[in-house]
């Protein structure tokens, strides 16, 4: 594969269809119950394998590349160290997802890097081994490596495959960065939602325990959600800032998007229980 370009590796966004905060552990981490679903919108990565062990990242967004702590480069380095491969890579990132939006952009990029380079470098790590590497980069990375919609609990490391309905979504992107760390450190965050079994969770009304706090702290999120909820059942994903509305038909979501005020941005995407990354991997 050396010096050949391998194009079009998707790094899809995810939505938290529900997010419950059960309690804060003594080590500071929070016990959660959440449901992840992929959507048909995300970043794209291209790779060229090299023989000199070097790692280079190019992007359509300069500050992504300038950050030496970039998750893509960290993922590639971890895979090199874990497998002792002498191969390197030149990587191109087409960044389409907002940073700090609660839709998993950085985590998804890291997962796609691990999956793609494991295949292109022929390092032959199993999916479980890749997920273990991914967990060192972020709690959400194993979900993207797993490649299937999943119920997660604990600190996000226990995954059970589920297949929620694949709605069309209108995802809106408020012009604000919400710090996940700040939200989880906030004394006003509810941390006492009782743990429920999966069947009960899947049949109950879905909500996000972080939403009320984020809406109070970030007026832009509140305004965006207030607008969207007039068109469809809507809530926040992750710790925000992105919010999403559920639609039965693509045209309904497109019609709502057409009404979007000029000071708001968003996109329409399809929920999918199999990651677009799986389809790309199958093409090798």
Swiss-Prot record:
Claim: Transferase is one of the keywords in the record: yes
An individual GO BP term: terpenoid biosynthetic process
Annotated residues for binding of ATP: 98-108
Keywords: ATP-binding, Isoprene biosynthesis, Kinase, Nucleotide-binding, Transferase
Catalysis performed (reactions): 4-CDP-2-C-methyl-D-erythritol + ATP = 4-CDP-2-C-methyl-D-erythritol 2-phosphate + ADP + H(+)
Molecular functions (GO terms): 4-(cytidine 5'-diphospho)-2-C-methyl-D-erythritol kinase activity; ATP binding
SUPFAM superfamilies: GHMP Kinase, C-terminal domain (SSF55060), Ribosomal protein S5 domain 2-like (SSF54211)
The enzyme's E.C. designation: 2.7.1.148
Catalytic site positions: 14, 140
HAMAP family in the cross-refs: IspE (MF_00061)
Family indicated by similarity: Belongs to the GHMP kinase family. IspE subfamily.
Protein name: 4-diphosphocytidyl-2-C-methyl-D-erythritol kinase
Organism, scientific name: Shewanella woodyi (strain ATCC 51908 / MS32)
Gene: ispE
């Amino acid at each position: 594969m050396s010096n050949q370009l391998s194009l079009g590796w998707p790094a899809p966004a995810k939505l938290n269809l529900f997010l419950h905060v059960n309690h804060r552990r003594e080590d500071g981490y929070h016990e959660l119950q959440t449901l992840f679903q992929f959507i048909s919108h995300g970043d794209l990565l291209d790779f060229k394998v090299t023989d000199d062990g070097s790692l280079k990242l190019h992007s359509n967004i300069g500050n992504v590349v300038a950050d030496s702590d970039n998750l893509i480069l960290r993922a590639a380095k971890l895979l090199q160290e874990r497998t002792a491969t002498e191969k390197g890579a030149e990587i191109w990132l087409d960044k389409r997802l907002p940073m700090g939006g609660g839709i998993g952009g950085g985590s998804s990029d890291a997962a796609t890097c691990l999956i793609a380079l494991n295949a292109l470098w022929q390092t032959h790590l199993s999916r479980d081994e890749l997920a273990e590497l991914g967990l060192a980069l972020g709690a959400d990375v194993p979900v993207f490596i797993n490649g299937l919609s999943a119920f997660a609990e604990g600190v996000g490391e226990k995954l059970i495959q589920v297949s929620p309905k694949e709605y069309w979504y209108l995802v809106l992107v408020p012009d604000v960065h919400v710090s996940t760390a700040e939200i989880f450190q906030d004394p006003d965050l509810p941390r006492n939602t009782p743990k429920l079994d999966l069947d009960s969770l899947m049949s109950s009304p879905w909500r996000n325990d972080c939403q009320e706090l984020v809406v109070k702290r970030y007026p832009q999120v509140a305004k965006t959600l207030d607008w969207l909820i007039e068109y469809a059942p809507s809530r926040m994903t992750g710790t925000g800032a992105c919010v999403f509305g559920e639609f039965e038909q693509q045209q309904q979501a497109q019609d709502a998007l057409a009404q979007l005020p000029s000071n708001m941005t968003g996109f329409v995407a399809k929920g999918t229980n199999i990651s677009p990354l799986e389809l790309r991997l199958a093409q090798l």
